[in-house]
């Protein structure tokens, strides 16, 4: 494993002005981690002085410039210290984790989900944590702008109504809880995972840590190669963000890769295995039905979901209904016992713009809405997965129908990609569609890397994919009226006009790349970030901001 990117924090990763800060809870003994960047100047925004900016931070302990971490030991089980006794869980006889912690499960007939407690009127430590985290220690600023800070009660209400989820398996004590819902900050997910053609456990753990450090709010382990269980264990024990999986992939490995030999029993045991390890949410393709297969098979690009194609093959081979649909209530009984959220997979998402918004896609969406209500009956947290390849002018309909058919459960989309001809640049393609759908109410964007449709991404691709989708999510937050997002842009604009390069680097979504590009270009002029009153795009004689300042000064 590369120690520079994982076990040993890079002291300059976020810049020398950056530090890790915590905000204490008032209901529970929690410490909410954030990033604080000190600014060289004091900037005035709406009459308020700012000499620093608190930022939402997904890097966890790995982002602490003073921390040392051994990925072979894992992170500290911080949630174990919060003192919340739900009275409904007990230890199992399951396999010990690499941290020597026995898995826990709900007592017979009980539920331990965030939705369960929310509906009972109970504010959990996780609810208080995400409320503090969403505000970024800027409650006074939010109120000054005419907004309302997020409160634990608001979080509880959103979770109780199913409009938001807090994916936090009781067996994943290492995570820093986060919330997914359209009334909160837009989140992004990064996919990692080995395949039969390459990648080791060390590489996947490194990519997971790398993704968190660059801004991934959740990580999905989509491993389909060897050592799936061990790879997932290492990732979970070192992840400060929720981890999702597609259990069907491991179930398929257990039957030698033959979809026809899958069974409910194999799948059920896989769910329990992964839930005991601490997986926070499962993508489950329960919405693809035998009756919808003819519509999907008539498409230009057929079924492009791996899980969807596996279950379609099983249905055809056995001439039976999808067992993930017929056993959905049984699945929910397992999920409620560990607080694993279900991400209802869009097995029939369009794989080309010619298939967008067709009968197969929207027929499945209605089924997902029906399954949402069944999951909620058991207090299981739900989010809905969405497309896919959709041209810009057809995106709005996706968001409107999702809200209508799926009862306002959070929407989680792969893009959408707005064209089919952007190979090599599909991360940008995805971010274009993602920005639009997130501004309309999508809660989380699944990142796409430059390798989409071409190959397995490496850690540089992960970084690129995360940052591009972080831009999309931030742009959507601005469009939705986020006062914390607006403040960051306001401070950046003021720093830019003042030629305070270090402040610009600190406020950028990618401080490292921003600093590197500027240093490489300004060196040829003999200036530095401390002295340059221009950039090499225009030079000292044609810098519009410099000229504007000179003109204003002469008036």
Curated annotation (Swiss-Prot):
InterPro entries found in the cross-reference section: ThiC, ThiC-associated_dom, ThiC/Bza_core_dom, ThiC/BzaA/B
Residues bound to Zn(2+): 389, 453
Binding site for [4Fe-4S] cluster: 535, 538, 543
One of the record's GO cellular component terms: cytosol
Pfam families the UniProt entry points to: ThiC-associated, ThiC_Rad_SAM
Reactions mediated catalytically: 5-amino-1-(5-phospho-beta-D-ribosyl)imidazole + S-adenosyl-L-methionine = 4-amino-2-methyl-5-(phosphooxymethyl)pyrimidine + CO + 5'-deoxyadenosine + formate + L-methionine + 3 H(+)
Sorted UniProt keywords: 4Fe-4S, Iron, Iron-sulfur, Lyase, Metal-binding, S-adenosyl-L-methionine, Thiamine biosynthesis, Zinc
Keyword Phosphoprotein: no
Location of region: Disordered: 78-104
GO MF, one example: zinc ion binding
Family indicated by similarity: Belongs to the ThiC family.
NCBIfam families named among the record's database cross-references: PRK09284.1, PRK13352.1, thiC
Protein name, entry field: Phosphomethylpyrimidine synthase
Lineage of source species: Bacteria, Pseudomonadati, Chlorobiota, Chlorobiia, Chlorobiales
